[in-house]
Amino acid sequence: HDENAFSFGGVAGHAGVFSCAWDLAVLARTLLNGGVYGRSRILSEESVDLLFTDFNTAFPGDEHGLGFELYQHWYMGAMATPRSAGHTGFTGTSLVLDPTTDTFLIVLGNSVHPVRSWRSGSAPRVATANQLARAVPVRPERGRTAWFSGMASASTATLTLPALRLDSARARLECALWWDTEPASDGLFLEASTGGEDWQPVPFTTVRPGPGHRPDPLPHPAGSVTGWSGRVWHRLEADLSVWRGKSLQLRWRYTTDQLYVGRGAYVDALRVRDGGRTVFDSERPRDAGRIGATGWVLSAD
């Protein structure tokens, strides 16, 4: 496929992903192990960390470590995280390393053979990466299943609670939330309606679990999240007191653009409290059966 290399007897003055799958797997495993393969240390942990560290912070969206690109959905697909590193080759080859799930993906192919008009860009890379990302499970926060948005592009999925009458000044929504979306392009929105037609954003806070002290709640005044939750469940609370004395519906709306997606969004352990009363609990079978899902599915992983 490389006419210049052919004319020079096989010599090519450029770099790319050139080797067999096994050699690349050894390289990937070594880097994910922090520089160790088997019983041999090849690189120091400090050196490996530099490969996964963004040194291009002045240019958001163009994250780059030493030698590797970082967080690039255009070929990493749903494997992309702020710590995911990768490299591509001209003919559609790619190597993606995701330390957050301890997984790697090698794609070897020749999309310009026998003719360059066959070139398919990064679509095979993204499709394969999405499948691998989906194969890594996200376990429910509670119980056997959680609501999953799916990973479809150019779509809108809604998860709607039944209409609930709220009479307390301390009414609130509580749930567990997990998200991984293409930053800014895709998002998860919490919305409310008193008539089932005009929906407005519901501000909320999230708390990421951590060792030791309880972290401060992170406000989401626009009632939405995008990007990466750190591959952990967050506790969400939303103040619903503004709808006191009204019948209220709540819904989650997950939207994606036409190009790339992340691992998706999960919602679990949904509860609506009206003061001292729990007026909705997704763990109660009767309440669970009243949830309206379009595009969302109950998933064990």
Please provide the spans of the model-predicted regions.
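Short, Gly/Ser/Thr-enriched beta-strand-loop segments that form substrate-interacting elements
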Residues: 1-2, 55-98
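Penicillin-binding protein/beta-lactamase superfamily catalytic region
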Residues: 1-61
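Solvent-exposed loop/turn segments at secondary-structure junctions
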Residues: 17, 23-24, 31, 57-58, ...
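Secretory-pathway/luminal and periplasmic proteins that interact with or process carbohydrate-rich
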Residues: 53-63, 183-184, 258-260
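Beta-sandwich/jellyroll recognition modules and their flexible linkers
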Residues: 78-83, 91-94, 100-101, 109-301
